[in-house]
Curated annotation (Swiss-Prot):
Name of encoding gene: rraB
Protein role: Globally modulates RNA abundance by binding to RNase E (Rne) and regulating its endonucleolytic activity. Can modulate Rne action in a substrate-dependent manner by altering the composition of the degradosome.
Subcellular location: Cytoplasm
Protein name: Regulator of ribonuclease activity B
Residues of the signal peptide: none
Region (Disordered): 119-141
SUPFAM superfamilies tied to this protein: Hypothetical protein VC0424 (SSF89946)
Subunit structure comment from the entry: Interacts with the C-terminal region of Rne.
Keywords: Cytoplasm
Amino acid sequence: MSIERLLKAQQEETRDIVQSLLDDGSDPDAEYMIEHHFSSTNFDRLEKAAVDAFKLGFEVTDAEELELDDGSVILCFDAIANHALDVDLIDKACEQLINLAAKQKVDYDGWGTYFMGDDEDFDDEDDDEDYDKDGFPIERH
């Protein structure tokens, strides 16, 4: 698929993701952690892509191995930016990162973020548990 077609498809997906989050009640004024996903079977190429993403101002996670359903293994990392859930900002980042991925011959696998809402909106079953100093639940009998 050409870069232009990838960009167009990504822009449509971005609008769908943002609208779904807002329709579900995610806070439109919150700062979101936007995680752009990259993968490759070639570590050297992936590392070059990570360096380039860092130079563009993104926080970059360490590369991790991921086993696919067919048993093959790929390497992946995320390029992270924190900002408003703004389609123009996300489109700009996607364009930069899709071009970067094409240059380094790695895969750009889209982006994701987390629902941002009032804490009261969540029913967390663990709210009543106490935790020890290491963060593990204390068992009650």
